Amino acid sequence: MSVEIPQQDVMIVTGMSGAGRSTVGNALEDLGWYVVDNLPPQMLKPLVELAGRAGTSLPKIAAVVDVRGGDFFSELRDILQTFGTGPRLRVLFLEATDAALVRRFEQVRRPHPLQGNGTLLDGIAAERARMIEIREASDLVIDTSELNIHQLATTITEQFSGADDAGVRVTVMSFGFKYGTPADADMVADMRFLPNPFWTPELRPLTGRDKAVSDYVLGQEGAEEFVHAYARALAPVLAGYQRENKRHATIAIGCTGGKHRSVAVSEELSSLLRALPGVAVSTKHRDLGRE
C-alpha cells in the first residue's frame, strides 16, 4: 500500500566506480541539496521516510549510494512500492567506457573494488554486470567518459538548477558517429542523409553554429521537413514523459564528425522544442572541436 507523504525531492546517485559519483554529490551540494555520501543501501528507506516526515526542512535530499554493498535493487523496489505517491524519487546513474574507467583508476593508482586477484578490467566487468538492473530502472543516465570533473559539475548544474516546475529537462546533443554513439541517449537521429558541408571548401572550417553552414544544411531537400516532423513526433513523447514523471531526456543528433550537419540540426530542433509546454531545453555539441 502506498503512503501519502509530502513532495520532497529525493535523488539517488549511483553508477560505476570511477564514473564521478563524488563529483556529482559535491555539485548537488553546491546547488543546495542535502547530500549523504556513501549511504548503505539498507539506509535508503529510512532516508526516504525522513524526507516525507511532516516539518522536514530538507526539500532536496541526495544519497550517493554504492550498490555493490547490498541488494540495492530490491531495496529500491520496496521503496517505490511503499512510497509510490510520496517524494519525487529519482535515480541518477553514472557510467563510463571501460577505457575511461581504466585511465581514471590508473591515474589514482588504486585497484577496482571488485578486482580481487584479477585484472582491473575484470573488476569493471563484474561491476557492470551487477549494475544492469539498476541502470535500466534509472531516470537519468549520464555517460561521463568524455567529461572532466568541471564539465561533469557543469552538466549537473544544467540538469538540476533552475525552476523546479519544469516538467522535462531535455538535452539535445550533437555528436559524430566516428566518435561513438552517446551511451546516455534516449533517442538517436542520423543526419548523414543530408549532403556534407565538409566537401564545400568555404564551409569546411566553419561549424553548424555558423549561419552559412546552418543555411546550407537546413536548405537541403528534406532537412526542414525532417526537423519539424521530428519535433512534432517528440511532442507526445515528452508529454508522456511528464505524465510518467520522467524528468530528463537526451536526444542525440549525429553526423559523421559532429561538426556541421548534426550541430545545425540540433540548434534548430532545440528552438522548436522550446515552444513545447513544460519542457526546458539545453543544447550540447559533444564533439565540436575534436577534429
From Swiss-Prot:
Keywords tagged on the record: ATP-binding, GTP-binding, Nucleotide-binding
Protein name per UniProt: Nucleotide-binding protein CMM_1747
Function: Displays ATPase and GTPase activities.
Positions with a binding annotation for ATP: 15-22
Entry superkingdom: Bacteria
Family the UniProt entry places it in: Belongs to the RapZ-like family.
Record organism: Clavibacter michiganensis subsp. michiganensis (strain NCPPB 382)
Binding site for GTP: 66-69
Organism phylogeny: Bacteria, Bacillati, Actinomycetota, Actinomycetes, Micrococcales
